[in-house]
Design a protein with these regions (language model features):
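Aromatic sugar-binding surface patches on proteins
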Residues: 146-167, 258-273
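Conserved, compact domain cores that house catalytic/ligand-binding motifs in diverse enzymes
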Residues: 213-265
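Contiguous beta-strand segments within globular domains
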Residues: 74-124, 157-159, 214-223, 233
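Proline/serine/threonine-rich low-complexity linkers at boundaries of modular beta-sandwich domains
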Residues: 57-79, 195-203
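Short beta-strand elements
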Residues: 186-215, 293-340
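Extended low-complexity, serine/threonine- and proline-enriched intrinsically disordered segments
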Residues: 103-141, 234-249, 286-291
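Gram-negative bacterial Sec-dependent N-terminal signal peptides
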Residues: 1-23
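Short glycine/proline/serine/threonine-rich loop/turn segments at secondary-structure transition edges
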Residues: 151-153, 166-179, 272-284
C-alpha cells in the first residue's frame, strides 16, 4: 500500500499591483512577515496541522451548503434564496431542498436607481433536477405546510425532498454534478428563478466504523478500517478533538488501495498535542473518506464522534518541531530580502 501525504497550499503572492516605490518600501515588512509565518508552519508536517479550538471543525465547515440568492428583474424584490441539506448525496439518500423569498437588504439596493416594484406572494415553488448531461431527473414541488420534511408550516421556508435513485447513479468510484433550477411564481405570474446543486457521489470505498489507536514515534496514530470495492486513490481526513470537544488537529493521508479490507492511518503530530496542553482520551470528532481518482471527486459522508482513544498523557508526545525543509528554505530566502 503506497502512501503519499497531501501538501497544503502555500501562502499567496507577496506582492500586489502597486507603484514600484510602494512595493520597494513594503517588501521588507511583507517578506519578514511571510518568513515568520513559514517558520511557524514548518513546526508541523504537511499531513498534520493544528486547528484552533475556537474555530469550527474544518471538515464539517467544508461541507456546509451554500445559499444561492437571485433577485427579480432589475433587482426587484423579493429575492429567491435556495440551498440543500448537504453538498453530496449517494444512492438511497433523501436530499432535502429549501427555498425562501425575502426583500433585499439596504446594502444590496442601488439607491440611485428607481425602485422596481416588489412582487407579493403567495408563491408556488417548484424545482427541476438536471444532471451534467442536461437530462431531467425529476420535477419537485416545494411545500410550507409542516409536512414531508418541512419543519414548520407557514415560516416562509419551502421544502422539497428527493430520494436519490439507482437509475441515475454515477459509476462506482465516481461522482457527477446535479443542478436544481428553482422557480417561484405568484398569482400575478411574477417569477423568481435561482440555481442550486449538489454532488451525486458513489464512492469506491467505505469506512467500516472500526478504528484503533496507538502511540508511534511521539505522535498519535488512529487507523481506520475501510472496505474497498474498486482499486484507486483514496483520501482519508480526520479532526482530533479534546474530551471537551475543542478541535486540536487535522490529519490527512492519501493512499492507493486495491479491492478488499485495509487499515489506513491518520497521524496527528505529537507536538500539536504537547503544545495544546491537553491529555486524552481524545475523540476523532470527524472523519471522511474520499475517492480521488477523477474529477469531481466522489465524496464520502462525514462521520462524527467516530472514535475515542486511550487516555494518553500529553507529555507522552514529542516536543520536537517537525522542521519542514521546504518551508524553512523559503523562509531563509525571504529573510534574505529583508537584509538587502
Amino acid at each position: 500500500m503506497k502512501s503519499k501525504h497531501i501538501k497544503p497550499l502555500l501562502a499567496a503572492s507577496l506582492f500586489s499591483l502597486a507603484p514600484m516605490a510602494t512595493i520597494a518600501a513594503a517588501t521588507p515588512d511583507l517578506a519578514a512577515q511571510a518568513a515568520a509565518e513559514y517558520r511557524t508552519m514548518a513546526r508541523y508536517p504537511e499531513w498534520s496541522q493544528p486547528v484552533s479550538g475556537a474555530l469550527a471543525d474544518p471538515l464539517l465547515a467544508g461541507r456546509e451548503a451554500t445559499v444561492q440568492t437571485q433577485a427579480g428583474p432589475a433587482g426587484a424584490g423579493p429575492a429567491l434564496s435556495v440551498w440543500a441539506s448537504d453538498i453530496r448525496y449517494s444512492t438511497g439518500d433523501t436530499a432535502y431542498f429549501y427555498a425562501s423569498l425575502a426583500e433585499r437588504t439596504a446594502s444590496s439596493v442601488n439607491l440611485l436607481a428607481p425602485a422596481p416594484r416588489s412582487a407579493a406572494g403567495p408563491w408556488a415553488v417548484t424545482g427541476e433536477l438536471v444532471d451534467n448531461n442536461g437530462q431531467q431527473l425529476a420535477m419537485l414541488s416545494y411545500r410550507d405546510d409542516g409536512k414531508d420534511g418541512d419543519q414548520q408550516a407557514g415560516d416562509g421556508v419551502y421544502t422539497a425532498s428527493y430520494v436519490l435513485p439507482a437509475t441515475h447513479q454515477p459509476d462506482i468510484g465516481s461522482a457527477k454534478n446535479i443542478a436544481i433550477k428553482v422557480t417561484a411564481v405568484n398569482a400575478d405570474q411574477d417569477q423568481r428563478v435561482a440555481l442550486g446543486g449538489f454532488l451525486y457521489s458513489q464512492p469506491g470505498a467505505q469506512l467500516t466504523g472500526e478504528y484503533r489507536d496507538r502511540l508511534s514515534e511521539g505522535s498519535l496514530v488512529i487507523a481506520a478500517k475501510v472496505d474497498v470495492a474498486v482499486a484507486g486513490r483514496y483520501h482519508l481526513a480526520g479532526v482530533l478533538a479534546s474530551a471537551l470537544g475543542e478541535s486540536l488537529s487535522l490529519s490527512q493521508n492519501a493512499v492507493h488501495l486495491e479491492p478488499g479490507s485495509h487499515w489506513v492511518d491518520l497521524s496527528f503530530y505529537g507536538l500539536i498535542l504537547r503544545e495544546a496542553g491537553v491529555s486524552g482520551p481524545y475523540t476523532l470528532s470527524s472523519v471522511t473518506l474520499t475517492t480521488a481518482g477523477a474529477m469531481p471527486n466522489a465524496l464520502g459522508p462525514v462521520v462524527t464522534a467516530a472514535h475515542v482513544t486511550k487516555p494518553y498523557l500529553n507529555v507522552q508526545f514529542t516536543d520536537k518541531p517537525f522542521a519542514r525543509a521546504d518551508l524553512l528554505d523559503a523562509a531563509t530566502r525571504l529573510e534574505g530580502l529583508v537584509k538587502r
